[in-house]
Amino acid sequence: MNNQSLLDGDYVRALDARLDSDEAYIEYQRAEARRALPFLARFFDVRNARVLEVGAGRGGKGIAYAQAGLRITSLDVDVDALGMGVNAARRAGVAMDFLAGDGARLPFSAEAFDAILLDSVIEHVADPFAVLQECYRVLTPGGVVFVVFPPFYGPLSGHIDDFILIPWFHLLPRHIVQRKLFSMERRLGFLTPHEAYAVFATLNRLTIFGFKRAARRAGFTFAYWRVRPFLTHPGMRLLVGLVSALRRPPRLENLRAVLVRARREFTVGTFLLFLLLSALAPLVFIPFAQEIAAGGVKVVLKKIG
């Protein structure tokens, strides 16, 4: 993905508004998919490819991919979320398939797809190996699986940071996390603390080491592998903005605009968190140490033969 797109006004607005409503979240998903498309195009022909999206949720990403020419089948266990996706696809005038199903028991014949998308999904399934094994079965030879997930021991990998922005808080005993969330009365758009806990409770504690082992056992080779830090959304925008502003020739007005935006977006707490995560960032290049520093892993798995 192009980090420069983090500064795109439409993307920033979609990101900031993503919890306002179901429709806003679908639009955010579409914006994320548009960012991902150039990367995906490096590994398979996105024109008319047969693509399965596992864990599609409300379907926004699949809609954007279908608009780009992919033949998308969106699958999820959440029937209500799929219903939102069906309605959104109809409003967008997009032809795509929605199907309720389990990633560990895919209802497709062998070699049915050219690519599979597991975007922020594999950390929630009961058996990651079973899902990867099924993906291998339904892929054509040479097909790829695009995977993104936050390793469980990363600083903000608990899916609760919309409410609790404390590094590694999710590693505390589950009843403490639950009590803290349930004590909060505020909600963020459609997201409540109880719903955030429900998402947290699905996490399978997937690690980088555990994912690699499961992928190899399923038969895949690695076509792309990257472990990255996550420095908070304001922090990522600050870094990308500074790099852009300081490129030759550096422009003082661009630098000033970046700093003004950062001052508006950061609180004292989030800026201190940004400094802590920045200090940890080099650890993502060190095996084993990366487990406690990573914000996310982006992988492309390939089926050979």
Pin down the residues of each PLM region.
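Conserved N-terminal segment of class I S-adenosyl-L-methionine
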Residues: 1-105, 115, 292-304
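A short, aliphatic-rich alpha-helical micro-motif
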Residues: 45-46, 110, 132
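Surface-exposed loop/turn positions
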Residues: 49, 110-112, 142-143
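A structural alpha-helix within SAM-dependent methyltransferase catalytic domains
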Residues: 63-66, 132-136
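A short beta-strand submotif of the Rossmann-like class I SAM-dependent methyltransferase core
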Residues: 118-121
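Helix-to-beta-strand junctions that scaffold the AdoMet/dcAdoMet cofactor pocket
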Residues: 125-126, 139-140
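S-adenosyl-L-methionine-dependent methyltransferase catalytic module, highlighting the catalytic core
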Residues: 129-130, 134, 144-302
